[in-house]
């Protein structure tokens, strides 16, 4: 969604296990679930604005896309051993051929290409990150193109760490699935799975999951109530992290945002997986839209990076969280 009140990157540290000397797992995570908590906040330069998706390409290097000019930006995000972000610098920007409203992006571990989801024309295409030239595209089921609601098409995109699975989702309910989310009820989005045999093989659409989003909780003033899925992140164990984002009018002057991170198990024998809340925050002007895996830290934690696309005059921040209770 093209709303920019500042850009935030969020690093989440993921504990594979609780080891001696580490903080104890919060009580809420007992029983195997994940729980995230804040570590620190970091402020970055204002440009480029409108970042809406992010993916790690190796080391401290990341690619991010914007939803205004169709650019792919290479970022260097440096973290210290504890996971705190030390710096964030834009290294280069490349315009992607024929793109205008980019929302999600995912690094292909087989060939280094970058796959992106475009909200404008409901496509998933691969690009050469050096030239910006389109080199491939995935076959998208017709149900999406025929039923998307304006400005609520493809948002989150992720490729599994092993490179064999890709997932994409629409932001809010398709026309054929009912009403979009509002302050009375949540919506239903479809998470589409693609699989391939290996390097050079085409993505084939396979399973489709129905995911229930939250209703808008903060709409005190009329005219603004939006809730939906903004980002996806596939983990090694078959779990999918789902980033939900709400925008509502809590005052007569300014909108505010709320972010929630859920986990769903795609190994379960159901096309309607149950979701479990692992983190949420009333983020004011920070509009979280993208999420990706980051590096492992010295403590054994795995970081995640989230990017926030707002719209207006908010600060550009980086926020570090820790995610406890890894399965």
Regions found by a protein language model. Give the residues of each.
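Sequence/structural signature of beta-propeller domains
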Residues: 22-327
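Secretory targeting and sorting signals
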Residues: 4-26
